UniProtKB/Swiss-Prot annotation:
Physiological role: Cell wall formation.
Name of the protein: UDP-N-acetylenolpyruvoylglucosamine reductase
Keywords assigned by UniProt, alphabetized: Cell cycle, Cell division, Cell shape, Cell wall biogenesis/degradation, Cytoplasm, FAD, Flavoprotein, NADP, Oxidoreductase, Peptidoglycan synthesis
Boundaries of every FAD-binding PCMH-type domain copy: 30-216
EC code: 1.3.1.98
Pfam families for the chain: FAD_binding_4 (PF01565), MurB_C (PF02873)
Example GO biological process: cell wall organization
Catalytic activity: UDP-N-acetyl-alpha-D-muramate + NADP(+) = UDP-N-acetyl-3-O-(1-carboxyvinyl)-alpha-D-glucosamine + NADPH + H(+)
Enzyme category, top tier: oxidoreductase
Coiled coil (residue ranges): none
Length: 306
């Protein structure tokens, strides 16, 4: 799939390479089979070069950040994975003594960025203080919590266009944000970095939000157990999926080692050795029960790789 010459070229341009790695070691669900190669570009230039080389050779690939919103087959996978692990640089620009523009590369931890900015008195990303994952994944899916979403603070995003091999800038309107969606999910663009606009606020008020959001997350979500986060998108504003699943008596229900969380029924956890089949079977079971009872079609929120 990747020739020795290409390996040497990628390495020379700043990519570490690992072979036959199991993706379960790179995901929060702890499920995922082996891939032929994982590439770890150390700079954005190395990332762009790797993308260009793979596209030119028609080598299939996927991008992984912190692996927190993925459900991956445990069978051998036939694509290359590019990790944004080392793409964690940030730049800061103050505006008018009140606003701050932050440019963060795609691999920056979203929760770490939230805390960093909050500690300096900048408001806007408090909602992300407990969201696992990277900036790239957060913008890709317009992640949100507690009334906030990525679209509220994004100014623009730098992307690599797979169609013509050019680096481009997309503004907020170009990104076509929706509920847990963006134009990035259509597959033509790979996110490189994003600029955010934050507002100065009282530190006391910011810290109060952080404490509130963090406490609620710890109390209500199984964040200490392997999962892929919320399994289903909310189909409409007044339809609460976790509450619905709980009311159907499914809290704690298991198939194999995959279990509907006893803490929050909107999550499926890995009790230890769950398989991809266990998880998918449980998802399909819940979807069928909800459809039969409420005539609502649930959509899965995490990406599924197979």
């Amino acid at each position: 799939m990747i020739s020795e010459d290409l390996k040497l070229s990628l390495y020379a341009e700043g990519c570490d390479i690992k072979q036959n790695e199991f993706l379960k070691y790179y995901t929060s669900f702890r499920i995922g089979g082996p891939v032929p190669y994982i590439l770890f570009p150390k700079t954005l230039n190395a990332f762009v070069n790797a993308l260009s080389q793979l596209v030119k050779r028609d080598i299939p690939f996927r991008i992984i950040g912190q692996g927190t919103n993925l459900i991956i087959s445990d069978e051998p996978l036939k694509f290359v994975v590019l990790s944004t692990k080392y793409l964690n640089k940030m730049n800061f620009e103050e505006k008018n003594n009140m606003d701050l523009i932050v440019e963060a590369q795609s691999g920056v931890s979203l929760s770490a960025l939230s805390f960093l900015l909050s500690e300096d008195g900048y408001s806007g990303l408090e909602f992300a203080c407990g969201i696992p994952g990277s900036v790239g994944g957060g913008v890709y899916m317009n992640a949100g919590a507690y009334g906030g979403e990525m679209k509220d603070v994004v100014l623009e995003t730098t992307v690599y266009d797979l169609r013509d091999g050019k680096v481009k800038t997309l503004n907020k309107g170009d990104l076509e944000f929706g509920y847990r969606t963006s134009i990035l999910q259509e597959g033509s663009f790979i996110l490189l970095s994003t600029k955010f606009l934050l507002k100065k606020d009282e530190l006391k008020r910011i810290k109060s939000k952080l404490i509130d959001f963090s406490t609620r997350r710890w109390e209500k979500q199984p964040i200490d157990l392997p999962s892929a986060g919320s399994i289903f998108k909310r189909p409409k504003p007044d339809f609460f999926v976790g509450t619905t699943i709980e009311n159907l008596g499914l809290k704690g229900f298991s198939i194999g080692e995959a279990q509907i969380s006893t803490k929050h029924a909107g999550f499926i956890i890995n009790k230890g050795n769950a398989t991809f089949k266990d998880v998918i079977s449980l998802i399909e079971y819940v979807k069928r029960i909800v459809k039969d009872k409420y005539n609502v079609d649930l959509q899965v929120e995490p990406e599924i790789w197979k």
